[in-house]
């Protein structure tokens, strides 16, 4: 088995065996990683690479945010669940704007907020 397949199998096993609260942290970690890659794309000189890297990583982050939102238990989550749903919608809208206009500051803003949520979940 080559290294890529081993890493993929390891990740699948880690996700399948993780506690629900750890899955949330893993999703936040993925969003943080993708947003970091999108921010670094602003250093690319090739316009195609610049646009493709930003678009790809923002859409991956949006997919994570939508999954986090979908997983919320709004019936039992109370005010916290409602607040998270509002934040996730805000993040999704801001990232859509960042993707259309290629605005680094918006990506940095969302990255900062998601990092704060990740740190709170990890405590």
Regions from the language model: what does each represent?
Residues 1-23, 27, 109-123:
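Short terminal interaction segments
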């Amino acid at each position: 088995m080559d290294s890529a397949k081993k890493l993929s199998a390891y990740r699948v096993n880690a996700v399948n065996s993780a506690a629900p609260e750890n899955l949330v942290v893993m999703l936040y970690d993925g969003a943080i990683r993708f947003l970091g890659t999108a921010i670094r794309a602003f250093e690319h000189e090739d316009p195609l690479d610049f646009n493709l890297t930003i678009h790809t990583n923002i859409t991956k982050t949006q997919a994570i945010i939508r999954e986090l939102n979908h997983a919320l238990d709004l019936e039992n989550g109370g005010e916290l669940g409602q607040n998270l749903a509002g934040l996730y919608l805000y993040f999704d809208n801001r990232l859509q704007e960042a993707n259309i206009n290629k605005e680094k500051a918006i990506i940095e803003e969302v990255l900062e907020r998601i990092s704060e949520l990740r740190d709170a979940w990890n405590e």
